[in-house]
Amino acid sequence: IEVLDFSPEVEIEKKNSKAGKNGSKSSNWGGFRGKGDSRSDSLNLPLGWSDESNLAWRMAIEGYGQSTPVVWGERVFSTSTEGEESERLLVHCHNLKDGELQWCKSVPTPVRIKRSQYVSQAAPSPVVDARGVFVFFESGLLMGLSHSGTELWRRSLTEEYGPMMGNHGIGGSLFQSADSLGVLVDHDGPSYLMRVDKK
């Protein structure tokens, strides 16, 4: 049995926080639920927003995605899929201040999945750190990218461990430590939990 300690992520995040305007802090948001506790270091956050108030920018993205965006420095990263069978998997990078698209990486899916209202699309949230952004899709594609969109590495978990089985797709988000990714594949087939080196 191996026990994984993912707590260093909290320390990494706190060291990278810096004061912003109006006394608020501009914090990195490294993954689903931030540092794992759904709390932001930012101060004076609005309690509500609408088209008329507390909305800095809005930007449409290609395709359809259900993941949570992640933030590192002045960049916001998100994922989506495109096509009737999610033929294209996309990673988007936008400027945090104005929403301007910095880059979009589009790759073919290793396995086509028929879209429906019951099947999740790009549901696993990515993680990001000083090294890059790491993404996982319901087709089994696991990929690391630099902050500028250069592909660092790619794996197909469906090729390595078999197809994802179930009626609703995969929704488990990545989690991370300083050097590793945690990947949970929980489905109708043999489920597994992986630790993957970020390098």
Locate predicted features.
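Noncatalytic, solvent-exposed loop/strand surfaces
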Residues: 1-199
